[in-house]
Amino acid sequence: ERSVIEEEIKMYADAPDELANDLFNNLVWPDHPLGRPILGTEETLANIDRKVLVGYMKEMYTASNIVIACAGKVEHEELVKLTEKYFGSLPKGERNQCLPAPEFNFVQKWVNKETEQVQICMGAKGVANNDSDEQYQMSVLNAYLGGGMSSRLVQKVREEMSMAYSIYSYHSAYSDVGLWGIAA
């Protein structure tokens, strides 16, 4: 599996749009896990071994850190029995504390890379998941501006002005912070 992840990391590094998004997230949140590449780096992957994974499992996979949810036609008593059967032996452990919300870093950075196209990412503070009133408004705004082929960005920048083949907006909402961005 390590070699598969190594190949994925190399593929991302060779995909200008993915690289631009990773660099953008790192600029926005340089000192926070949200600013790190999801796959990690070749260096972080090389430093993971069985001992690290087992330690992580022991710390994180505890009863205090797990929520079991079920929806649909389910017998409550049967669900409780199954939950106890498969998860009852987990140690209680201590609930992990969430990291504080990262500060939004407003910066510009230009990176030169020999490619056929230019990649641009820009963004602003978005809406967090815990902001129930504004998260739905943000979803509608994002869909209107850049959420598909009929969006304003695609119609104006791609179709009318022929300035980019691909352009879209996105909203990444986390528990206590959000990021709204445009990428082309």
Label each PLM-derived region with a short phrase.
Residues 95-151:
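His/Glu-based metal-binding/catalytic segments typifying zinc-dependent metallopeptidases
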Residues 130-132, 152, 165, 176-177:
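Short acidic/glycine-rich loop or secondary-structure boundary segments that cap or lie
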